Amino acid sequence: MISSNDFRTGTTIELDGQVWRVVEFLHVKPGKGSAFVRTKLKSVQSGNVVEKTFRAGESVQQAILEKSNLQHTYVESGDYVFMDMTSFEETRLSSEQIGKGSKYLKEGMEVNVILHNGKVLEVELPISITLKVTETDPGVKGDTASGGTKPAILETGAQVMVPLFISVGEMIKVDTRNDSYLGREN
């Protein structure tokens, strides 16, 4: 159990059978009446954000999360197979469990898997990854100044908007949080 007075950004709690992460919190001490804690909570499973108010000192069940470092080894019949780097156990995850990050998974890539009571809650990919451009419109000389973008398909099948000067075969860095181009990789 954790007191609402001890809430911090990133604290995980259990409410109504779901795991929530505290995104924002504010301790309010009105001149009249009792103090309370106003929070903004994000569901770890669905990503929904709700606002909830707790009485000061109210006890809430703290969610104990485990973080496991896994390496993506291969894909078999629609499931992504990962290997635990310490125990060498295999774990199978569906693309629904991985979420939108499945389009960036490459063999040999290491990810962090967040577990709660043995159940996968979320898969954390590296913030930036380097991938090869496999398909895009050809770049034309002098396209660097206009600042335009074009779609490019990467080696994993993901589609990202890249500058006009990027051509097929180049290695680029991509931000996995918002699917954006970060730059060329040398």
Curated annotation (Swiss-Prot):
Alphabetized Pfam families for the sequence: EFP, EFP_N, Elong-fact-P_C
Annotated pathway: Protein biosynthesis; polypeptide chain elongation
Family annotation (InterPro entries): Elong-fact-P_C (IPR015365), NA-bd_OB-fold (IPR012340), Rib_uL2_dom2 (IPR014722), Transl_elong_fac_P/YeiP (IPR020599), Transl_elong_KOW-like (IPR013185), Transl_elong_P/YeiP_cen (IPR001059), Transl_elong_P/YeiP_CS (IPR013852), Transl_elongation_fac_P (IPR011768)
Name this protein carries in UniProt: Elongation factor P
Entry's Gene Ontology molecular function annotations: translation elongation factor activity
Gene Ontology CC annotations of this record: cytoplasm
Membership in a protein family: Belongs to the elongation factor P family.
Subcellular locations according to the entry: Cytoplasm
Known function: Involved in peptide bond synthesis. Stimulates efficient translation and peptide-bond synthesis on native or reconstituted 70S ribosomes in vitro. Probably functions indirectly by altering the affinity of the ribosome for aminoacyl-tRNA, thus increasing their reactivity as acceptors for peptidyl transferase.
The organism of origin for this protein: Prochlorococcus marinus (strain MIT 9312)
GO BP annotations listed: peptide biosynthetic process
Cytoplasm keyword on record: yes
